[in-house]
Amino acid sequence: MEQQLTLVLLDSPKGAKYVETFEEAASSSSSSSSSSVPSCTDHRHRTFVKFFLYFSLVALAYYFIISSLAVSPIPPTLPQSSPGNVSSAKCDLFTGDWIPDPTGPLYTNVTCRHIQDFQNCLLNGRPDVNYLFWRWKPRDCDLPRFSPSQFLASVKNKWWAFIGDSIARNHVQSLICILSQVEEVEEIYHDKEFRSKIWRFPSHNFTLSVIWSPFLLKSETSSNSDIQLYLDQLDHKWTVQYPKFDYVVISGGKWFLKTTIFHENNVVTGCHYCQGRNNLTDLGYDYSYRKTLNLLRDFVLNSTHKPLVLFRTTTPDHFENGEWNTGGYCNRTMPFKEGQANMKTVDDVMRDVELEVFQKFGKGFGLGSNIRLLDTTGMSLLRPDGHPGPYRHPNPFAGVKNKSNVQNDCLHWCLPGPIDSWNDVMVETTLNRERELYDLTG
């Protein structure tokens, strides 16, 4: 019996593949019969040796098979409570630690063709790979690893949508990379800018969308004017499609920090970061963000269509000694421990607004509600090592005398990378809601 497991770790910029191969082999051979007649003692001795070798080989084969399962992405069963552990339905999935995980990611930059160049850190020459070998572990329960085969089986004939900015796109690309290890996806639509897309997994009739809507609201912009933001109108681009969706992951983000002019009831009411132009009052980004999330929440709760809506919380960046346009960088290679990282003020403010709006009626809006909070902020804060940094482009330091002149990306995530764990908590949050509904209906 021979079994071989090949794990492709990465593709170097020069195209060289690094491969670790594990081989398991167990073989047995029939012993040839002797022409001489053995003595009774010899016979018993040979019989004992045969049995010893036989059971040793069986035990060895069993050990190797079990070992191979430990590094293979075998779909986990639905999580069960274990002695001394809290079931995930009662567990805070978002308070925990990053622990070493020698199994590594479910895909690589070689096995997934859907990684955007800016997030393809290994192909762009990032020299370290330690950031790939961690997984998120909640404090009080076990979190099953994402199973692409189980996920696809559960979403047959369903439609998932991700709505937001480039971080939403980053997230959906992570999900597609994982799922494409089971079934390759077909892109069936994209807009002119390739920002909004629709994919389909044909054998499961599963549809997956990403909708570019960085403000979630109606907005207008041109090259020579500030962004006009309508605080009382959601973006028609996603609301007209909303009745099609069975599951929605929606999020705000750093776009609210841009210079924006606020409109309410067809009247300009203020602005953010407008530096007093036109004598407008600077109401701040928290004002527009709060208005947006309240409008979003009311739309979801009042709609007759009831998909499961996961609101994903803000994503902190990890720029140090500057921002993206002032020489900021991120060169850490290990996760933070609890207490080592502090949220920046802008992220703190956005998170406070999110919790104010989405925890107003209690955790999860109460049993049976179709809104859940996908609170990835804390787990993301602990991963300064997971960003492209300078490796948003191939070989970023080639021919550069001053490395500080190389722009870093410390907001988006490498693929594969920490963002893959968002899918673990996303699926478990979805399952917990299904369990709640089952308990309510009996």
Swiss-Prot record:
The entry's localization annotation reads:
Membrane
What's one Pfam family here?
A: PMR5N
Motif window: DCXHWCLPGXXDXWN motif: 409-423
Keywords, sorted A to Z: Membrane, Signal-anchor, Transmembrane, Transmembrane helix
A GO CC term?
membrane
Name the family: Belongs to the PC-esterase family. TBL subfamily.
- What is the protein named? Protein trichome birefringence-like 26
